Every structure is written in structure tokens, then in C-alpha cells.
UniProtKB/Swiss-Prot annotation:
Keywords: Cell cycle, Cell division, Coiled coil, Cytoplasm, Endosome, Isopeptide bond, Lipoprotein, Membrane, Myristate, Phosphoprotein, Protein transport, Transport, Ubl conjugation. It is a lipid-anchor. The record marks 217 as: Interaction with STAMBP. The modification Phosphoserine is found at residue 200. It is found in: Cytoplasm, Cytosol; Membrane; Endosome; Late endosome membrane. Residues 2-113 are annotated as: Intramolecular interaction with C-terminus. The acidic C-terminus and the basic N-termminus are thought to render the protein in a closed, soluble and inactive conformation through an autoinhibitory intramolecular interaction. The open and active conformation, which enables membrane binding and oligomerization, is achieved by interaction with other cellular binding partners, probably including other ESCRT components. Residues 59-64, 168-169 are annotated as: Important for autoinhibitory function. This is Charged multivesicular body protein 3. It comes from Rattus norvegicus. A motif (MIT-interacting motif) lies at residues 201-212. The keyword Cell inner membrane does not apply. Residues 180-223 are annotated as: Disordered. GO terms for molecular function: molecular function inhibitor activity; phosphatidylcholine binding; phosphatidylinositol-4,5-bisphosphate binding; ubiquitin-specific protease binding. The lineage of its organism: Eukaryota, Metazoa, Chordata, Craniata, Vertebrata.
Length: 223
């Protein structure tokens, strides 16, 4: 559909500038989410070290899986920033074309970037809105419905490879959990003597509550 196929409330240049502002705003949101997840990851690292000292192998594995999920989430957020940069570059090109041709043009680069961005849950709503506006303006073509579906790889992350879990544990404990790339079935370091390991049943319950709270915080940050 061409730019002037339907009545436009705003001129093309204003539309492009508005889209660029929205993209930059979402990039700041993504940056903030990355920082929040990474801060929480540092807390998880400390918890892994504490659990290793107490000989809590299962807790270590659970926390390592949380770190894997968090790192995958951060990687996706960084990828989304790259796509948003591509869209911003596309917007600059549109302004250049607008000055010469007097109208906006279709852009396969912007189309590809937007197809990826509408799959990112953290920014999905804004990207859908922008996509619809860009379709009306004729910059991108209508996207298939399945491109709007949120990608849920929770199951995949639940089955994180043992090698990756072991690598995380080896990294955090500086090799205290065995030698890389050994499996997580390797014995943990001997528990600390006497007082340190004479934890009461109440302490164990507190540990479980702390673990659940940490998992909940990470899940909230990733969603």
C-alpha cells in the first residue's frame, strides 16, 4: 500500500521521527532490563558459592539453570538492540529517500528487523504497534500472524545441557565443583565443619524460601 493510499494524520517525516523516538525509548527499557538481570545474576552467583560450601548440590544445579536462563534472556535482549539499531538506520534512510523522492519506500531491512522484534516479549506490544503503523505507511508489508506469536522456549531452557550447567558451576566456584568439563554428578566439596553445617530444619526452610524468592525475581525480570 502506498503512503498516500489512505489519509495520513501526520506527514511522513513526523511519522519517521516518532518511530525513531519510540525505538530509542524501547532501547533504554531493554538496557534497564539487562542491568536488572545482571544484578540479580550476581546475587545468584553468591548463592551458588554459599550452597557449594554447604554441600547442597541440588541447589547449585537449580541456581545454575537459573543463570543459564538469565544469560539466554540477556543475549536475546542484546540481539533485540541490534535489530532496533537496524530499524533506526532504516529510518535515517527513509528520511533521505523522503527528501529526494517525496515519499517513503518499502524497506526489506526494516521488515526483517521488525519481524524479529515483534517476537521479543519485553518489547512486543510497542513493536506490534510500530509494525502496523509502518505497514500503513507502506514501509513494510503485512506480516504473517505467526511472526507475532511470542516465542516460549521455557521447555528448552528447562532441559539445559549438563555440560553447560557444569561449566557455569565450574566458573562460579573457580573449579571447586570438579574439573571442567566434568558432569554435575561429581562430588561437591566437603561441607564446612561443625557449626557451619549444623543447620537446623528452620534454616533449611529459609534456604528453600530464599531460593524460591530468587527464582521468582529472575522470572519476573525475564518476563
Amino acid at each position: 500500500m502506498g503512503l498516500f493510499g489512505k489519509t495520513q494524520e501526520k506527514p511522513p517525516k513526523e511519522l519517521v521521527n516518532e518511530w525513531s523516538l519510540k525505538i530509542r525509548k524501547e532501547m533504554r527499557v531493554v538496557d534497564r532490563q539487562i542491568r536488572d538481570i545482571q544484578r540479580e545474576e550476581e546475587k545468584v552467583k553468591r548463592s551458588v558459592k554459599d550452597a557449594a560450601k554447604k554441600g547442597q548440590k541440588e541447589v547449585c544445579v537449580v541456581l545454575a539453570k537459573e543463570m543459564i536462563r538469565s544469560r539466554k534472556a540477556v543475549s536475546k535482549l542484546y540481539a533485540s538492540k541490534a535489530h532496533m539499531n537496524s530499524v533506526l538506520m532504516g529510518m535515517k534512510n527513509q528520511l533521505a529517500v523522503l527528501r529526494v523522492a517525496g515519499s517513503l519506500q518499502k524497506s526489506t531491512e526494516v521488515m526483517k528487523a521488525m519481524q524479529s522484534l515483534v517476537k521479543i516479549p519485553e518489547i512486543q506490544a510497542t513493536m506490534r504497534e510500530l509494525s502496523k503503523e509502518m505497514m500503513k505507511a507502506g514501509i513494510i508489508e503485512e506480516m504473517l500472524e505467526d511472526t507475532f506469536e511470542s516465542m516460549d522456549d521455557q521447555e528448552e531452557m528447562e532441559e539445559a545441557a549438563e555440560m553447560e550447567i557444569d561449566r557455569i558451576l565450574f566458573e562460579i566456584t573457580a573449579g571447586a565443583l570438579g574439573k571442567a568439563p566434568s558432569k554435575v554428578t561429581d562430588a561437591l566439596p566437603e561441607p564446612e565443619p561443625a557449626g557451619a553445617m549444623a543447620a537446623s530444619e528452620g534454616d533449611e526452610e529459609d534456604d528453600e524460601e530464599d531460593l524460591e524468592a530468587m527464582q521468582s525475581r529472575l522470572a519476573t525480570l525475564r518476563s
